[in-house]
């Protein structure tokens, strides 16, 4: 990051920061896309099993990742204030904390997984696939959150291109491993959807190893000497990170878990409906990476300017990002509407699944438009280190307004499963309006 004076320079710098983040986020999500798409080509049951497994995993992944992402604004503020000496301490404590959180997830998952799956109305085979998909995926949790901690350090320095390179290296590896393990190639048995979990876990270990190598050997990361002196765990640093990260993580968890709750509630419908819902949701999640990336870039840009006490510049970056995110979402919606049949056929060849997927896609277009406003604003608020009210807004919008609305529409109107998607759209739209009001309040207060 560096100081800019004109709008043209701000746009140029913002694009430089945004593009690597966007490519990285899309590439990370492509792993889930490959898991779902290739499992669906194996069978509708495998698609449904991976869908249920993903619906349980994604809220945990994104929630914990939100806590880890708190390192990005902390680093951005330190760089903006020209305080580099505290960076190694922040990174090491972040790694300790991510390890502890990973172990907690593994323990809770080991205890709760079977009871949760057994409480759902699933075919036995779908339940088995979901269980072992999650178990195999879980073997990569520790390296995954180690990578995200190091990535947050890289992004906080404005070096977003480096994390992009790591993911781009790993993406074809993940696709090849999926192909081998799902369909059974080169003498290895076909694992179906479970093979997707194995492949993704192996990929997590690979990207973790590459990231460790880069901060040791690649400029400018090695100049910070992050591991030159190993420091003991310090609870006060954990508390500082959790103070920012926990509200971020919980806010993201409340948003992503509503989609998971909808998938779980849909277990009462047949396998084809579950498969079609997950196919549409999976592709919509891929599109969500666009506004999410804008939000992450705003966290860096706004955090840097706020750290340097240039509040007017922080405000200009904020509205630049919001308008950019909305433009991208409108363009993506047009593409999705035009090529709905092509998208549906990526996931399954069953005619019923294809037609249901196309119907779900119509609702997905409106869902991602609402997210295009909310996600960038959340990113800007993180740059201001304003995270607590975001948590409250997420809880009320998604769980008190969105999900009950969806449940009522699904069970008491002719919309049936599509009613849940209308509820999601209502929740996201409510959240976006509330977040905008909060942003205006913070900016006025900061003047």
Curated annotation (Swiss-Prot):
Organism phylogeny: Bacteria, Bacillati, Bacillota, Bacilli, Bacillales
UniProt organism field: Oceanobacillus iheyensis (strain DSM 14371 / CIP 107618 / JCM 11309 / KCTC 3954 / HTE831)
Protein name: Probable multidrug resistance protein NorM
BP GO annotations: monoatomic ion transport
Similarity section: Belongs to the multi antimicrobial extrusion (MATE) (TC 2.A.66.1) family.
Transmembrane segments: 11-33, 53-75, 95-117, 132-154, 161-183, 193-215, 244-266, 286-308, 317-339, 359-381, 388-410, 420-442
Role summary: Multidrug efflux pump.
Main location class: membrane
Gene Ontology terms: cellular component: plasma membrane
